[in-house]
Curated annotation (Swiss-Prot):
This is Protein kinase domain-containing protein ppk2. The gene is ppk2. Residues 42-63, 82-152, 187-217, 286-343 are annotated as: Disordered. Residues 82-104, 294-316 have a biased composition (Polar residues). One of its GO terms (biological process) is intracellular signal transduction. The protein kinase domain is predicted to be catalytically inactive. Residues 137-152, 206-217 have a biased composition (Low complexity). Its main location: cytoplasm. Keywords: ATP-binding, Cytoplasm, Nucleotide-binding, Phosphoprotein. GO terms for molecular function: ATP binding; protein kinase activity. SMART domains: S_TKc.
Length: 665
């Protein structure tokens, strides 16, 4: 047991402890209820109220950003159970014109929300900014992509609508009423109205987007007489490939190049899914390139399209152009019966907007259209793989490939030349010669069958001749007399005369492209596509190798070059030696003159043959006769004798024929 003194001492301590606890509790309650003022402290203790350490600097950069977010989170946790309430999401707020906001306050007693009309506090502004942080914005950001999208904005008006690049510098901001029936058929500059009041979250988000778009000052960038025709969007944004009447797939018609003249911009409005399409056309283009498709019929509920054959994505990228009001269109668009009584249904004079293109663009469009018209008339727009099989590629030179194939039905062997028209530099010469080629038919020329247009390539089909029947394969084996040589030269001259009269120069006449037949007739190959539009003029027309030294850049002198080549062929047949163009050092430019060549065989040939060689070898100097004069006046060609080439062909050994089949590769 404790003594009396110890008990009294312990009792005094416990009494003091209880009084201290009560005073501390009362002071804490007072601090919770009211704040102390400096005047409540004694005057002597004011001097002692000094900070123990300097105040810390506010956080900076990213650390400050996260620190402010963390402090705001702590404040929301501390004051969340008090009277203050958290601001609701943005879609539950409705801003008023007087600066106040209607805040939805969730009461603790009842689950139903209550609406409070009061001014927004700074904490509510903070929560509002946080709710707007994840929403899409139309503001320009400091990124690489913003520089490329400076003139267009990607609009996502509805979840099911595709993003469309809208050039906002060409259009005014239009707004529509709620009912789709009240949509005007034609919107002019007076069809502006205030946006509707949003009632649903979708309309709120759409209204926010439209308000951001309308805030941009674009009204003064469009002429007042520029109008936009409205029609419901019932087709896909990308036009599909249409099947041409002459082909089955990937067919290209001349109307495909009318697409650069049309720039359609389709958007889906808030209600009605309307399609805003502005048809730009040039008056000068319609006069020079009119093919019956310049007028467009616009009907409500239907979208009239242009007959495009390629997959064309609109709007077509345009270069900087000058915009000017268009002249009145002679054929005005037709309107539906429901839009006749509408006050805005009258079509102004400048309903069609005019875009003035440069002269270079107009010439390019006209030239491409001319090319496609030729291709459409001369070529079959089908896949050649449907008609020919067993393709064997035998040579490839630049953009020209040569194939040996077999027809699917009658199994006839043909030669197919494939030209990539997009890679050919002089397409005009290629297509014009293809046009001439379709009318060529001569007994001394390799027969031309047909042409195909598929995947931007031209496939030309020719008659096939066995390489073992080439004249170069027979020269080392057999001796030809002057009468036989005269018969061969006459056959070659007849074929060249027909080519020259048709406006085609061969340029590549050698013994490698002359074929013998059993009907005692010669066939000249490699005559097609021999104009100087291909950089390297080798392996173009026949399945034989053609040297480069016979190619002449000057197209006008090509006819005389063919006459000189005829003389070299005659001299080679007589000598029975490897031809002059077997050696790279010998060419037309480096070969000796006519007198030197004739003196080598002097004493072995007749006078008529000597005169024939001098006339043909001097034709390059433009002093000799052309091929027509040579046929009429040459006495050497008159004493020709019919040669039976069947005997020569039958005497060839089968092994030699197989060895010479692909000797040119």
């Amino acid at each position: 047991m404790l003594s009396n003194s110890t008990f009294h001492e312990h009792h005094a301590k416990s009494h003091f402890h209880n009084n201290a606890c009560q005073s501390n509790a009362s002071s804490s309650a007072c601090r919770a209820s009211e704040d102390h003022l400096v005047s409540s402290f004694p005057n002597d203790s004011i001097i002692d109220l000094q900070p123990s350490r300097p105040a810390p600097e506010p956080p900076k950069k990213k650390f400050g950003y996260y620190a402010r977010r963390l402090s705001g989170h702590f404040l929301s946790l501390i004051h969340g159970s008090g009277n203050s309430t958290r601001s609701p999401p943005f879609h539950l707020q409705n801003q008023k014109s007087n600066g106040q906001s209607e805040v939805w306050h969730s009461s603790d007693d009842s689950g139903s929300p209550k609406r409070l009309n009061r001014s927004r506090s700074s904490k509510e502004d903070m929560y509002r900014r946080r709710s707007l942080h994840g929403l899409p914005s139309l503001s320009r950001r400091n990124s690489k992509k913003s520089s490329t999208l400076s003139r267009s904005i990607s609009l996502h008006l509805r979840s099911e609508s595709a993003p469309i690049s809208l050039p906002i510098h060409l259009y005014k901001s239009y707004s529509y009423n709620h009912s789709p029936s009240s949509l005007p058929t034609v919107l002019n500059s007076q069809a502006l109205s205030s946006p509707p009041v949003p009632t649903t979250p979708d309309e709120v988000s759409t209204n926010r987007l439209s308000s951001s778009t309308s805030s941009m000052n674009c009204r003064n960038l469009v002429p007042d007489n520029f109008n936009i025709s409205i029609r419901p969007n019932t087709t896909n944004y990308r036009s599909s490939i249409q099947e041409n009447s002459n082909g089955n797939r990937d067919s290209i018609s001349p109307s495909a190049y009318d697409a650069p003249l049309l720039h359609n911009v389709d958007t889906q409005s808030i209600d009605g899914f309307v399609s805003v399409a502005s048809h730009f056309s040039s008056a000068s283009t319609a006069e020079s390139l009119d093919d019956g498709h310049s007028a467009t019929t616009i009907q409500q509920g239907d979208v009239s399209s242009y007959p495009l054959s390629r997959s064309v994505s609109t709007p077509v990228p345009m270069s900087p152009i000058s915009i000017s009001p268009a002249k009145p269109s002679p054929q005005s668009p037709k309107l539906s019966q429901s839009a006749v009584g509408h006050p805005s249904s009258s079509i102004p004079a400048a309903a069609m907007h005019k875009v003035s293109y440069s002269d270079d663009l107009m010439r390019f469009v006209a030239r491409e259209k001319y090319y496609l018209q030729i291709v459409d008339c001369l070529c079959t727009q089908k896949d050649p793989l449907f008609f020919y099989t067993d393709f064997t590629k035998i040579c490839q030179q630049d953009t020209v490939g040569t194939y040996v194939a077999r027809q699917t039905l009658d199994k006839e062997v043909v030669v197919i030349k494939r030209f990539d028209i997009s890679a050919v530099t002089h397409r005009r010469l290629l297509l014009e010669e293809l046009q001439r080629l379709s009318g060529l038919s001569h007994k001394n020329l390799i027969r031309y069958n047909e042409s195909f247009w598929y995947l931007n390539n031209i496939w030309s089909v020719f008659e096939y001749k066995d390489p073992s029947t080439k004249l170069s394969a027979l020269i080392p084996k057999y001796f030809f007399s002057e009468l036989n040589i005269a018969s061969i030269c006459y056959e070659i001259s007849s074929g060249l005369a027909f080519l020259h009269n048709s406006g085609i120069a061969h340029h590549n006449l050698t013994t490698e492209c002359i074929y013998l037949t059993k009907s005692s007739c010669l066939k000249i190959g490699n005559y097609a596509f021999s104009s100087p539009y291909i950089e390297r003029q080798t392996n173009r027309g026949a399945v034989s190798h053609v040297p480069d030294w016979l190619i002449e850049k000057n197209y006008k002198e090509g006819f005389m070059k063919d006459v000189k080549s005829l003389g070299l062929v005659a001299l080679e047949i007589f000598q029975g030696q490897p031809n002059f163009f077997r050696k790279s050092i010998q060419s037309i430019q480096l070969t000796p003159n006519a007198n030197v060549l004739v003196n080598r065989v002097r004493g072995l040939i007749s006078q008529e043959f000597k005169e024939f060689l001098l006339q043909t070898l001097q034709a390059e100097t433009l002093q000799g006769p052309n091929i027509n004069m040579l046929l009429e006046t040459s006495s050497f060609l008159e004493k020709r004798q019919t040669l039976n080439f069947e005997i020569c062909l039958n005497n060839l050994n089968l092994r030699e024929r197989k060895a010479s089949r692909y000797s040119y590769l």
